[in-house]
């Protein structure tokens, strides 16, 4: 097996371009899903046990944000102003709608209280248009656990990226 130093410049350039193609394809697929679902994050991972038994930690959720009307009982993913981790919880109450902005109150299935303590300071409900990323339309159990492992053990990220890079560069066509 030849190493990187033994490769011809043209062959090395082809492998680097192949690696760039893989990365750009993944990025384009993400952006395509974002546009189709009208959500900046069309796929999210459940990070806590607050939605058990409906969703477990590590479940991969698919979001859809095309419908502006959200019903009580629907599971939504929302962002809190000033925090960058999305929260997955169920709508327990809704206010307004029609000509007035739709406001939502959410709660985790495994939590005792609603989410008013989680919302931004001075906020007692979610604005459907501004805060909600999307509604959950499907999920794959435990597939997202890799994301949790990578965030809890950052060194795994470097190992994984290094292995992927070496595999692409050493791949023969």
Swiss-Prot record:
The keyword Plastid does not apply. It comes from the Eukaryota. It is a single-pass type II membrane protein. Keywords: Endoplasmic reticulum, Hydrolase, Membrane, Protease, Signal-anchor, Transmembrane, Transmembrane helix. The active site is at residues 50, 89, 115. One of its GO terms (cellular component) is signal peptidase complex. InterPro entries: LexA/Signal_pep-like_sf, Pept_S26A_signal_pept_1_Ser-AS, Peptidase_S26, Peptidase_S26B. Its main location: endoplasmic reticulum. It is found in: Endoplasmic reticulum membrane. The chain crosses the membrane at residues 16-36. Residues 37-173 are lumenal. GO terms for molecular function: serine-type endopeptidase activity. Disulfide bonds: none annotated. Residues 1-15 are cytoplasmic. It catalyses: Cleavage of hydrophobic, N-terminal signal or leader sequences from secreted and periplasmic proteins. GO terms for biological process: protein targeting to ER; signal peptide processing. Residues 159-170 are annotated as: C-terminal short (CTS) helix. Its EC number is 3.4.21.89. Component of the signal peptidase complex (SPC) composed of a catalytic subunit SEC11 and three accessory subunits SPC1, SPC2 and SPC3. The complex induces a local thinning of the ER membrane which is used to measure the length of the signal peptide (SP) h-region of protein substrates. This ensures the selectivity of the complex towards h-regions shorter than 18-20 amino acids. SPC associates with the translocon complex. The C-terminal short (CTS) helix is essential for catalytic activity. It may be accommodated as a transmembrane helix in the thinned membrane environment of the complex, similarly to the signal peptide in the complex substrates. Belongs to the peptidase S26B family. Catalytic component of the signal peptidase complex (SPC) which catalyzes the cleavage of N-terminal signal sequences from nascent proteins as they are translocated into the lumen of the endoplasmic reticulum. Specifically cleaves N-terminal signal peptides that contain a hydrophobic alpha-helix (h-region) shorter than 18-20 amino acids. This is Signal peptidase complex catalytic subunit sec11. The lineage of its organism: Eukaryota, Fungi, Dikarya, Ascomycota, Pezizomycotina.
């Amino acid at each position: 097996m030849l190493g990187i130093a033994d490769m011809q410049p043209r062959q090395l350039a082809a492998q680097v371009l192949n690696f760039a193609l893989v990365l750009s394809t993944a990025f384009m697929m993400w952006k395509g899903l974002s546009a189709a679902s009208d959500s900046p994050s069309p796929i999210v991972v459940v990070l806590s046990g607050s939605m058990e038994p409906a969703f477990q930690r590590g479940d991969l959720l698919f979001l859809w944000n095309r419908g502006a009307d959200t019903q009580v009982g629907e599971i939504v993913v929302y962002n809190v102003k000033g925090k960058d981790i999305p929260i997955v919880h169920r709508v327990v109450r809704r206010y307004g709608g029609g000509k007035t902005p739709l406001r939502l109150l959410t709660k985790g299935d495994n939590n005792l209280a609603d989410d008013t303590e989680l919302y931004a300071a001075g906020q007692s409900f979610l604005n459907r248009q501004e805060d909600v990323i999307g509604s959950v339309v499907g999920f794959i159990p435990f597939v997202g656990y890799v994301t949790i492992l990578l965030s809890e053990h950052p060194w795994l990220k470097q190992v994984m990226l290094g292995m992927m890079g070496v595999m692409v560069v050493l791949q023969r066509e």
